[in-house]
């Protein structure tokens, strides 16, 4: 998925700074995605740019797309990151410049590693179902791996942890001894948590990780905080477990990882280490080099926005 903001602001994030356990509720914002989809952007937000290596989170739906085209994101580039496609309802057709062609369905992991450069498109396939509901997330690649070869993975058999009214699907990384088959380049976790009505349980966590949670359906209570869709709850580090409650059926995404100590520059769909990295990537996309071609998409590719006239300034992990 692309960041389709007309004037995406460059930002430098990461760097040192650990916190103990906190409960910081941070609102997201509504962002149009293509012609027919509006997403809730929860990361980066007004208070925080990263949670571990997680640096971008869009939650969309559930949307009724019976008489709509659904998701239509033309070919666009990525650099220095991984994209994680996660669906609750519907399906998304992924194409990329490696030649991958894959339909991603609910509770299947679509994991694309851009490494040094890749381009892809995402669209609701012809004859798509009535609803679309899911999340698109990005993971920043550490400096040692940012020039790795691009790849795409599709995993349909993900580990699930069940108990106490909680069902946790490990999307990426490791949680409570269960490990996703998706490739990772830094210690992290992404999990889909389903809570049945009456759930009152505690989920084991890694105290070295920082965590955040966001509700994707219903309303639940996370460490005593009532959490509805549209907000992100930053939980900090130093937690050995996480209290979870639900009066009605609900679901959450849990994101975590070791605090990302490197400083990164993120603009549009690129992650680099300097403004020059970003400028070079934009030039290469505009001139048709480095990122390759997405074959089979019926339409034009996305044009890169204009770079802002300001120099990048260090901002740290929080704004």
Which positions does each model-derived feature cover?
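Jelly-roll (double-stranded beta-helix
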Residues: 1-319
